[in-house]
Amino acid sequence: MLHTLPHCASSVDFPALLRLLKEGDALLLLQDGVTVAIEGNRFLESLRDAPITVYALKEDIDARGLGGQISDSVVRVDYTEFVRLTVKYANQMAW
């Protein structure tokens, strides 16, 4: 399943998101959700042991001036790769 997070993590039920993550899922951070990808962020730390891949939209990272602060554990994707993710994961959950 592809989970998308367009909001800062404190504005959603992040513990529920963590509970619903399954092996092989992906989490795509976009809009204000890219703040989760900042190195040392407590929400990112809680994702470290999850059996998923965390992606963040490059355009939203750049728009917020966060390029140098994003963790190396997060895969940066552009809009084309975003579309590929939506095709790869038939099921999606927006937070």
Curated annotation (Swiss-Prot):
Protein role: Part of a sulfur-relay system required for 2-thiolation of 5-methylaminomethyl-2-thiouridine (mnm(5)s(2)U) at tRNA wobble positions.
Q: What family is reported?
A: Belongs to the DsrH/TusB family.
The compartments listed are: Cytoplasm
> Per the UniProt entry, what are the Gene Ontology biological process annotations, in alphabetical order?
tRNA wobble position uridine thiolation
Q: What is the lineage of its organism?
A: Bacteria, Pseudomonadati, Pseudomonadota, Gammaproteobacteria, Enterobacterales
Subunit-structure text: Heterohexamer, formed by a dimer of trimers. The hexameric TusBCD complex contains 2 copies each of TusB, TusC and TusD. The TusBCD complex interacts with TusE.
Could you list this entry's UniProt keywords, alphabetically sorted.
Answer: Cytoplasm, tRNA processing
Q: Which domain of life does this protein belong to?
A: Bacteria
Q: Which Gene3D superfamilies match?
A: DsrEFH-like
Report what the protein is called. Answer: Protein TusB
Return the Pfam families for the record.
Answer: DsrH
Q: Which InterPro entries does the annotation name?
A: DsrEFH-like, Sulphur_relay_TusB, Sulphur_relay_TusB/DsrH
One GO cellular component assignment for this chain's record is:
sulfurtransferase complex
Which gene produces this protein?
tusB
Keyword tRNA processing listed? The answer is yes
Q: What is its main location?
A: cytoplasm
